Amino acid sequence: EHGRTQERRLVNFLDSIKHKASAVYLLGDMFDFWYEFRLVVPKGYTRFLGKLSELTDMGVEVHFFTGNHDIWCGDYLSKECGVIIHREALTTEIYGKEFYLAHGDGLGDPDKKFKLLRWMFHSTTLQTLFSAIHPRWSVELGLTWAKHSREKRVDGKEPDYMGENKEHLVLYTKEYLKSHPNINFFIYGHRHIELDLMLSATSRVLILGDWINYFSYAVFDGENLFLEEYI
């Protein structure tokens, strides 16, 4: 029921911006677990998927960046909901400003265990083997893994901000900015904390928080970028 309440809040927020937004960018981890079989997708998320479809039917671009909980998005969201899928970081210009958008997993993180897991999750061979398991068991396994991942966090939240000299995404961004000084805004998900940090006179890095605990999002009005909350 808690998850259903969070979903309704997110859907109500998307409904409130459908006549104002020219594009919506979802930076990953929108699902606890998502895996597409050839003819089967996980049950649930009905209201959310319906709202995405409504937005795209209205002509609003919806961009979906795969996160580490929804790595295995196939073509269902694009074919059925009209969503544009991104599996890598995107650099794009919006109203004259340069944006670097990414989920953020694997960027600047030296953790060898995480790198191994990420390689396994992206392995087409392992995905083929996983697809051979009946969804009755494979989806249950995926949901159990996601639940275990959540329960490792304190109060269901990610560790607090570690400071700009320790936060992997900030360190990665600083290094990337050296060779791409024209980028104005770096925006990430993944860490599930709220952060808005100036890196130079013309560049900022934002981590968006999430839609489970913070109900946070960024909005760009053509001139300025704001980190806000819809609850």
PLM-predicted stretches and their roles:
Residues 23, 97, 203:
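Conserved catalytic motifs of the protein kinase core domain
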Residues 104-168:
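Active-site-proximal loop/helix segment associated with metal-binding centers of metalloenzymes
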Residues 34, 72-73, 108, 139, ...:
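Hydrophobic positions within alpha-helical membrane elements
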Residues 82-87, 100, 105, 109-117, ...:
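Conserved beta-sheet core of the metallophosphoesterase superfamily
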Residues 24-31, 59-65, 99-103, 121-129, ...:
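Low-complexity, flexible helical/coil segments
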Residues 2-94:
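Core catalytic region of metal-dependent phosphoesterases/phosphodiesterases
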